[in-house]
Amino acid sequence: MMHFPEYQTRIYEEVRSNVGLKRRISPEDKDVCPITNAILLETHRMASVGALSLPHKTTVDTSAGGFTIPKDTMVFVNLYSIHYDPTHWDEPEKFKPERWLNADGSLKKEKPTHYLPFSAGTRVCIAERMAKMQLFIITTNFFRNFEVSNAPGEELPGLKDGIYWSTLNPPRRKIVVTKRKHN
């Protein structure tokens, strides 16, 4: 979010307008914060915790993408690759939360089948709903009260910095967290 102070401001303004600055943010507030939800969806697309799906095992000889996959082969889906595939996403290298919004600013109800930050099918993350709600509450509370920026003299990190093995391991950063002055 250091790259996008305008989105930090948009989260703040949305929360200020639709929830307020005093009361505790609740799960029900998710419905009145489409911009925040779109920002979280785009963040999940670009920086999923897991780069690969959990393992799957083929039960029959099959093929995919022109490759033969014998029965009993362990298969991992490259979720990172899917989230950056230009055949699925317009300008996948760009942070574009607007891709998740309708023309009227409401959040799109249907998510594309190639959006898989929590995997899919029988191996989908069992805590997906809880994780999304916690991330919403943490994000809205944080940006309602603070702004985050790069530390002076520090190079702004790249959007794809970090090491992916089975999970994302972002590098350490020096940041500045500034308390907002509420008007």
Language-model features: locations:
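Central I-helix of cytochrome P450 enzymes
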Residues: 1-16, 43, 70-78, 116-117, ...
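Cytochrome P450 heme-binding "Cys pocket" and the immediately downstream C-terminal segment
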Residues: 5-8, 12, 128-166
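Conserved cytochrome P450 K-helix E-x-x-R motif and the immediately C-terminal K′/meander segment
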Residues: 25-66
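Beta-strand cores of modular interaction/reader domains in eukaryotic scaffold and signaling proteins
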Residues: 34, 63, 68-70, 74-78, ...
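Conserved cytochrome P450 K-helix/beta-meander segment immediately N-terminal to the heme-binding cysteine loop
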Residues: 61, 77-106
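Cytochrome P450 heme-thiolate "Cys pocket" and heme-binding signature region
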Residues: 65, 102-135, 161-163
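C-terminal helix/juxtamembrane-tail motif
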Residues: 73-74, 80, 164-183
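Conserved beta-strand elements of beta-rich interaction domains across eukaryotes
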Residues: 74, 81-83, 122-123, 137, ...
